[in-house]
């Protein structure tokens, strides 16, 4: 299928400013962006269909670099709680009641929300084999999937079973080119050194990266210093974890040395600004990490703590929170936030041919309707995305040249069934 977006405003990479907007034609041939420029037809493109780009904005699809998709079931059910109370006293007891069907529909709900708000790829940490990966696969989104790994010692049978869950999903869904996999040790406070070493051995054996929660709370730092004699970042670095492609979620409580280590090792730091603020964990040192060259990307975390998976909200918040916290209007710019939410996020997930609008790259695209009072006059399209848009201006979403949503119509997912099943599940779990 050859699709032409005719005369559409596109957010394109720009060496000087990061991004610039240009009215142009964008041609998609099967799964790939084949042409960006003036008059694609005159330049030899033969479209099967042409989409009028007037009053529309097209950008690379957004990338959610940290979430727990199945936890969309827990939206608005664990609020105004401090982090450890939220996790251990509220979330984990509800997780114990989940069935495979619950997690399937919770994940479908997450995928539905992400599609409707312009996300085309995400990094997931989950708690079960098959049902979650199956739901993601059926959605059409791209995803890097990690089974959350908890264990004590190399011989922990439960810990070994969780590793096998990862390998099972890899074998079962390995033919789906939109899916990648990572090892997902949950955190240093739910694993010990022996188990982490086993996880790294398996990561090396299968050529996988690592997805881990890191330095999320003050308590995590204090406990690590007491137990390990150093920060969580230093502990994992000394262990050799950062020799792997690593995505470290949160990275809120970092020392200068920690930031230097992350920068030197090329670790992707997935900041979750809304979730971290809501759970009282504070603000990550984003301006300092940017200055040091840390690879920063943005995640929403789960709907159980955010309470949405809307990347527009987190792009907005990361800019505003750090401007206010640093008392500097230049602390984090809209263009920096958009890069975190697209290009850097895609690389964090291991998708090297997406995240920007560029010829030869995957046609993972988000199209917005800009005829809203809150967006007009647009003036600066990147600023409009970060400071004015809600996310529900998204009109169409394409992955590998396939529309997952077109003119706000979702393809291939039963919205009403998803809503019904998720509400039914929560009445049983927390009714």
Feature names for model-found ranges:
Residues 1-45, 56:
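N-terminal metal-binding scaffold of metallo-dependent hydrolase/deaminase domains
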Residues 11-25, 279-280, 346-383:
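Acidic, glycine-enriched loop/beta-strand segments at the rims
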Residues 73-105, 139-155, 159-160, 218-245, ...:
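Active-site gating loops and adjacent loop-to-helix segments of metal-dependent hydrolytic enzymes
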Residues 75-141, 163-175, 422-431:
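Alpha-helical scaffold segments that flank or form the walls of functional sites
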Residues 131-252, 257:
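Metal-coordinating catalytic core of metallo-dependent amide/deamination hydrolases
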Residues 238-245, 287-372, 388-389:
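His/Asp/Glu-enriched, well-ordered alpha-helical/loop segment
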Residues 362-419:
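C-terminal cap of metal-dependent C-N hydrolases
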